[in-house]
Amino acid sequence: MKRLTQTLVLCLLTTFPVLAQSNYVSEVWVSDLGNGKYKNPVLYADYSDPDACRVGDDFYMTSSSFGCLPGLQILHSKDLVNWTFIGAAVPDALAPIQTPERPEHGNRIWAPSIRHHNGEFYIFWGDPDQGAFMVKAKDPKGPWSEPVLVKAGKGIIDTCPLWDEDGKVYLVHAYAGSRAGLKSVITICELNAEATKAITPSRIVFDGHEAHQTCEGPKFYKRNGYYYIFHPAGGVPTGWQVVLRSKNVYGPY
């Protein structure tokens, strides 16, 4: 009788986990439906202000990391749906221009842009309290260079570079009104050939106060002789997307 009881207990202990596993449904979000289709969001996580570039058949993405470390996490994809973490561009420390006395949630690394030029990857971002920074690497997995302060200034945010056919390098950016006392404008400055330093003042190329307030987050492209600036406006909850175009880098757009 004792042996029978032990056998029954053993059977119950081995059966219940199997039943539990057979009834378990994973709650992990999977955007790839497996049939050539997908559902949004493709990343069910906090990847604010994402930006991506394509190199051959590969896509690389980064996003705002604010005061968190490792910062500027790099994701890789072949199809823009399935993403894999491959590294971080700011793994150990934030740009050491000013060290706050206490953690500053929501500050530091805002709205980066990742680009590939002449065999190197570049990431530009704005620190709303310090200015525009840049890091670069030959391999997106790293190692990445130390952050370089490209343009100092309060309120400089949402930076994006453009390498023109004539060798000139430009940087488009917006302003955080909370720091600069100025917002709803898009500006452009020229950088040196190494893209490490601004060599001209920023010029306003678009003023959104009349019809496109809170214009920010500009992305800079050139195609078929036209310069394009894509940017959101109207604020996060009720905003819209604006596309600007000009034959001249400084406008009119």
Model features per residue range: what roles?
Residues Q21-Y253:
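Carbohydrate-active catalytic/glycan-binding domains of CAZyme proteins
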Residues T7-P17:
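Bacterial N-terminal signal peptides
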Residues M1-L4:
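Positively charged n-region of N-terminal signal peptides that target proteins for export
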